[in-house]
Amino acid sequence: MDTNISKRFDDWLKSDSSAAALVMRQWLLPVEGKDTVIFPPTYAAPNEMSETEKRQWRQQTLGYNIDRLDGGATVCQIDSVGAQANRMEAIFKREPYKKLVPQVTITVGQTKVNLLDAGHRAADGVVRFSSLRDKFDAAFRSIKDNGDAEPLAKIAPTSIVFGCWDSQSTGVKLPRIVRSVIRAYEVDLLHRSAQYTPPVRYVSAGVIEVPEGVSDRILSKLGLRDTPASWTHGGVKLRPEKGEIRRDAVLNLAAIRALGTNEAGPDDEKTLKLRRYILGLALVAFTAPHDTNLREGCQLVPNAERPSKWELVRHDGQHEKFSLSHDEALKFAEDAAHDFVVGPDEDANFDQQYAKQQLAKSKEERKKEKRQRK
């Protein structure tokens, strides 16, 4: 281990640091070119809307998360903060990154779930109902009662990097240290229509007899009748002059400095080892080349004509150019992980009996138990 490398960013990690965050802007384009259509994710209408409001919402947005600003500008979400976090976190399942974090696997029936795939991370239900629940609960309580994040960093460090909320037990909230989102600016909304025609007219050909009460809609769902799909979501298209797709990412250095251990001093060596380790993981995720094949119809590539912009932002608002290659970030992370000592891999089982006991409790009993845990 190179001590100079592992301590390279200590000025960012000490309590009196003036560094607020690293910020990155990356401009992207559809793989086919700027003038082609891309498909954002679609979402269900909010539950609190009435049926009339839901219909109006679908007509206006087609299910996309798109905002219309004063003056006619539009902003469309292409990949959410949560989706980006899931994509970044997944790199720690593969080489050469997997050795940087403990690999925690929970067996649920015939399925093995890697903690890195759990949407709520250390606070996920797959953890709460596993044989590791007491260990995770103790780690969250260590943060809540003592401000000591080391136990959680030993078992689920990416839950610190990408954030989690232990809402069902201790109530501990960990903000995202790494936050990324992809948005498209100045886009026009498009529609599309489609028609499915079966290879055989099953009813008119006498191949099937339709029982009484079976509607044409049911036949369509079964693939036995024509199925039109008219005026549905057809993607978005960048406007020729101002349209752009941009990934905005932040690495919150202040959030790392808020991490402590059970040592007395705010900047003691044990605490700095923890902060270096978490910073190393964050830098690896922040600088790694990520797959931007987001979904069907939405494959993006970096805009070769607009290089990414990396800056270190100070608390006084000053912006400084910042440069760090992914190889440099990985080397720093490896040295910091060696110094911190990565926690061991864990294999656990989903506790069906415990889950059954919890499900059998009344709503009032669960609320009382939750209050007691907090």
Where are the language model's segments positioned?
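Surface-exposed cap/loop segments at beta↔alpha junctions
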Residues: 88, 102-104
